[in-house]
């Protein structure tokens, strides 16, 4: 399982969580951490704290320097950079997984991410949609998994603080001023007046017919596995 590690709380928590899960799950698997350094401003980021953390847990870790930052902000000068950045990162992550011999790519999305994506698709594109918990990429022969989808952002933050996990602060020029950040604030406001807002949205996702979201009773988990080509 290759984990795409940005350095933020979600991907760091996911990496350590998967490494620790091997002790209890009943079958073994390998965890490989990979960071794609976008090199915003043409400068490499310092990921020393992550190198030290993953070394303590015995997790192989690779940093790949990319030109994603300069391409998005300097060459293309995107007014809405997130879509292009995400597309470039996806391609680079999938390539890294294949080159490293991994058949699964784990992403650190949590419940808040899913809720925000649901409303962003509704408002911006007028459609009911969200990423799937599990997605099979037939052309790449890779499976994307999102193991933390039922955890809230606050639960992830709590785990990071409890374990004292280090994070690398984002230096993206668009950080905090994106449409997602506006949607995140909407969700926060709704949750202040309706504490069940996230769970209600999760129920809507599960009843929406979106691939992979309808729960099934397996005895161990609630998500069905969907094969969806991307």
Give, region by region, the residue ranges found by the protein language model.
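AMP-forming adenylation/ATP pyrophosphatase catalytic core
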Residues: 1, 5-10, 29-34, 43, ...
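The feature marks non-catalytic terminal segments
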Residues: 165-230
